[in-house]
């Protein structure tokens, strides 16, 4: 090798490593390379070169040159000329296989000196960087998603190739946590917001709870379809950019969810009011419709016509109602399809955030700090569902088009501004995605404890790009991990009852304790979800400080499941009866509960059995004024409430007032107290459950393991959950709203049946989770829940970095070796 060729070859090698000679005095501006008085130790400069060129060239075995070998040396001079080192023998032997081929093993037979000789240029005594390799046929965007190859881009923030130096300070775990948690919170907020407006949606579209349950399961279907494939391909690529793409998709889905309001809003409201009108009854101007501008001929459908022979029914079908019913049904089908597609897309979008973000955090923090980060992540995630309920309570206080309809939020005709939530949440998510796009593939190195210096990076084998043909093998490796499978089954049984409970918790509180919709949402947020967040943070701190064993963590998870199941059984006997409903007959086991007329006068009123408009008189409640035999009404100016008089079935009360009677049931306090204790106890298992999943599989398979669990939870938990619980809720219905012979939403539930079925099925499924947790506990001795982190100087490192120990560890399908 001549001096000229050696000079060119050495400079090309330096530049491929990121070296940028700035002057003639041996001071280099490389990325993390040690400077040693104008001379470089080739063992340090050689390390990144191995990681860049060792993919597919040979069998992966390269002889590292001895530390005494000098890559190049410089002599101070005015012409800034670099002099090649005298002895390149060791280096040439070490790079022999690399110099004879390209990066991917498809060399053209030219050496590096021949390939880049034409790039020599007098730039501060150095050479221009070689052009970007064109062997990879992927686009720039695909390359970005796969992580790229630039050393600078792997540790700095930026967009579209612009990575200013001041942005490097933001490439930290703390900044990523802020953006990631914002996305995580918005996702949880979106789902519980949708749950909080279910009553409004059911009333607007006249659909059953089972239908809304199927609608809610669409989000989980999106996760099932994409979880494992996404985590397999994106888990080894540029995870922040994949997460950002999911956030953009989620934003689009949220915006589309609000489209029905802007397309069909006015028409739906007009149709809904027509279907709620009854054409026969004494006139009452106070019940005119704001939307229809009804005249004084419009009537109150709740009053009694004594001795009347007309067919008085809210489901009477004249021509106008039939046409409106047909039009309303067509619009409802279109709107439900839009909702289904929106929730399906949002499920795909949130899969990227949930399954890629947590492993990304775990990879960038020490194993000792991981429990605390997991606790903060899961704890802050709880703010999303809580905020969703609170935001839903706020939005439903506004009328759907911000007009004054002539009645307040307690009126059955009230339709809240349900569409505000998707617009606001989608906008915030879109803004957060911009920040997520700017994060690098790998954050900067972990902080070292005081007094401990960083060790030089060891040779790292590059990760092989995931291939579709290897996907089944990776899935089989996860399925053969027995601990992961039992932990997955446990997660399904843990989350299925909790998801079902919270989906219909506001409705349960409304029915059981006669709360307003916005009050039920606030209680569900503060007494349930925020308590859960407190328990998660406390458990994370406990694991961080006490460092329990994996078996101890598994035992605690089983214990919390047993406590939760027992608590639900206790709550089955804590509720409020419906004995203050006139004519109520509870179920006796053979026949369902029902409400019958209380006097013969009501039998002659031809009342609409499907029109639930409760009134209160003398401490008793009646389905409607008609069922109480009331024949006249008036409006009380002080509070705009309707007063009914001349009630044949209430001789001792001169008048009755619309709405529920005051609830004298004191069991609400006991319910909230016991429920909060159960929620707190169960939430303390969340961090330990996450750590068991992350530690029971190979480090490279963490994202894939999350994908397996996410798919299983979606397929066997979250998809059937709202359908099962929706059917349970519908089974407790006493009065259905019916229009032209078609059942709509439920107007009144039997409190006893609702309580026993709703909480009973929750207790039973949670007990199955307890049984699965016992199996995990027996096998958990094979898991090291807090392994020594090599980058923190643990004894297990042996001078190697974490990446080396992961890449060198063989991946075998045997469960015992993967744990």
From Swiss-Prot:
Biased composition, class Low complexity, residue ranges: 91-111, 144-157
Domain Kazal-like: 593-651
Disulfide linkage: 599-630, 607-626, 616-649
GO CC, one annotated term: basolateral plasma membrane
Alphabetical list of InterPro entries matching this protein: Kazal_dom, MFS_trans_sf, OATP
Keywords linked to the UniProt accession: Cell membrane, Disulfide bond, Glycoprotein, Ion transport, Membrane, Transmembrane, Transmembrane helix, Transport
Bilayer topology annotation: Multi-pass membrane protein
Record topological domains on the Extracellular side: 196-213, 264-332, 395-413, 510-522, 575-667, 729-756
Subcellular location(s) of the protein: Cell membrane
Keyword Glycoprotein tagged: yes
Glycosylated sites: 284, 293, 309, 401, 604, 640
Top-level taxon in the UniProt lineage: Eukaryota
TM helices/strands, residue ranges: 175-195, 214-234, 243-263, 333-353, 374-394, 414-434, 489-509, 523-543, 554-574, 668-688, 708-728, 757-777
One MF annotation (Gene Ontology) recorded for this entry: organic anion transmembrane transporter activity
The family this protein is said to belong to: Belongs to the organo anion transporter (TC 2.A.60) family.
Function: Transporter that mediates the cellular uptake of ecdysteroids, including ecdysone, from the hemolymph.
Stated name of the protein: Solute carrier organic anion transporter family member 74D
Record organism: Drosophila melanogaster
Gene that encodes it: Oatp74D
């Amino acid at each position: 090798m001549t001096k000229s060729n050696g000079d060119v070859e050495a400079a090309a090698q330096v530049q491929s490593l990121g070296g940028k000679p700035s002057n003639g005095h041996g001071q280099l501006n490389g990325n993390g390379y040690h400077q040693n008085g104008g001379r470089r130790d080739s063992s340090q400069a050689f390390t990144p070169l191995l990681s860049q060129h060792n993919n597919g060239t040979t069998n992966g075995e390269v002889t590292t040159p001895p530390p005494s070998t000098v890559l190049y040396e410089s002599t101070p001079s005015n012409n800034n000329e670099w002099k090649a080192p005298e002895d390149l023998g060791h280096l040439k032997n070490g790079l022999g296989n690399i110099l004879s081929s390209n990066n991917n093993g498809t060399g053209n037979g030219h050496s590096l000196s021949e390939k880049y000789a034409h790039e020599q240029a007098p730039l501060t005594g150095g050479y221009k960087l070689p052009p970007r390799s064109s062997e990879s046929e992927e686009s720039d965007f695909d390359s970005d998603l796969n992580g790229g190859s630039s050393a600078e881009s792997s540790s700095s923030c930026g967009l579209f190739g612009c990575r200013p130096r001041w942005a490097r300070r933001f490439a930290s775990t703390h900044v990523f946590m802020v953006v990631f948690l914002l996305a995580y919170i918005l996702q949880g907020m979106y789902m519980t917001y949708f749950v909080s407006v279910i009553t409004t949606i059911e009333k607007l579209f006249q659909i059953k709870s089972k239908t809304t349950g199927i609608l809610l399961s669409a989000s989980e279907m999106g996760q099932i379809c994409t979880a494992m494939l996404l985590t397999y391909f994106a888990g080894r690529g540029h995870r922040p950019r994949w997460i950002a793409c999911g956030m953009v998709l989620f934003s689009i889905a949220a915006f589309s969810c609000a489209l029905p309001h802007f397309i069909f809003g006015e028409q739906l409201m007009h149709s809904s009011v027509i279907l709620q009108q009854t054409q026969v009854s004494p006139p009452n101007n106070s019940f005119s419709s704001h939307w229809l501008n009804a005249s004084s001929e419009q009537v109150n459908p709740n009053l009694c016509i004594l001795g009347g022979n007309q067919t008085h029914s809210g489901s009477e079908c004249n021509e106008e109602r039939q046409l409106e019913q047909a039009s309303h049904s067509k619009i409802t089908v279109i709107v439900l399809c839009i909702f289904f597609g929106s929730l399906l897309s949002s499920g795909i979008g949130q899969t990227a955030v949930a399954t890629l973000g947590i492993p990304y955090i775990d990879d960038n923090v020490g194993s000792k700090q991981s429990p605390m980060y997991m606790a903060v992540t899961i704890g802050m995630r709880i703010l999303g569902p809580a905020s969703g309920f609170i935001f839903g309570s706020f939005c439903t206080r506004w009328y759907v088009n911000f007009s004054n309809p002539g009645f307040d939020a307690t009126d059955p005709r009230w339709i809240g501004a349900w569409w505000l939530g998707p617009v606001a949440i989608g906008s915030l998510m879109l803004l957060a995605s911009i920040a997520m796009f700017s994060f690098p593939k790998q954050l900067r190195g972990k902080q070292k404890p005081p007094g401990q210096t960083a060790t030089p990076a060891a040779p790292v084998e590059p990760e092989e790009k995931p291939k579709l043909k290897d996907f089944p093998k990776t899935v089989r490796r996860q399925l053969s991990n027995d601990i992961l499978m039992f932990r997955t089954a446990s997660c399904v049984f843990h989350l299925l009852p909790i998801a079902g409970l919270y989906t219909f918790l506001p409705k349960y509180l409304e029915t059981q304790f006669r709360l307003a919709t916005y009050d039920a949402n606030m209680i569900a947020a503060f007494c349930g979800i925020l308590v859960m967040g407190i328990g998660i943070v406390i458990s994370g701190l406990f694991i961080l400080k006490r460092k329990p064993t994996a078996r101890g963590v598994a035992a605690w998870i089983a214990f919390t499941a047993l406590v939760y199941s027992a608590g639900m059984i206790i709550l089955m006997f804590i509720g409020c009866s419906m004995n203050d409903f006139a004519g109520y007959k509870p179920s006796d086991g053979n026949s369902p509960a029902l409400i019958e007329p209380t006097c013969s006068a009501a039998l002659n009123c031809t009342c609409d059995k499907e029109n639930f408009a409760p009134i209160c008189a003398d401490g008793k409640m009646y389905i409607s004024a008609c069922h109480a035999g009331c024949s006249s009404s008036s409006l009380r100016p002080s509070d705009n409430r309707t007063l009914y008089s001349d009630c044949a079935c209430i001789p001792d009360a001169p008048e009755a007032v619309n709405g529920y009677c005051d609830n004298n049931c004191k069991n609400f306090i006991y319910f909230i107290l016991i429920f909060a204790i159960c929620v707190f106890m169960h939430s303390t298992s969340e961090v330990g459950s996450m750590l068991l999943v992350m530690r029971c599989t190979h480090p490279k398979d963490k994202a894939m393991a999350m994908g397996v669990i996410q798919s299983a939870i979606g397929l066997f938990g979250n998809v059937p959950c709202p359908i099962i619980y929706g059917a349970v809720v519908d089974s407790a219905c006493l009065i259905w709203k019916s229009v032209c012979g078609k059942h709509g939403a439920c107007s009144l539930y039997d409190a006893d049946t609702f309580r026993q079925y709703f909480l009973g099925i929750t207790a039973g499924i949670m007990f199955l989770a307890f049984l699965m947790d016992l199996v995990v506990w027996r096998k958990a001795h094979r898991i090291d829940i807090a392994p020594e982190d090599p980058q923190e100087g643990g004894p297990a490192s042996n001078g190697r970095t974490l990446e080396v120990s992961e890449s060198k560890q063989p991946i075998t399908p045997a469960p015992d070796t993967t744990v």
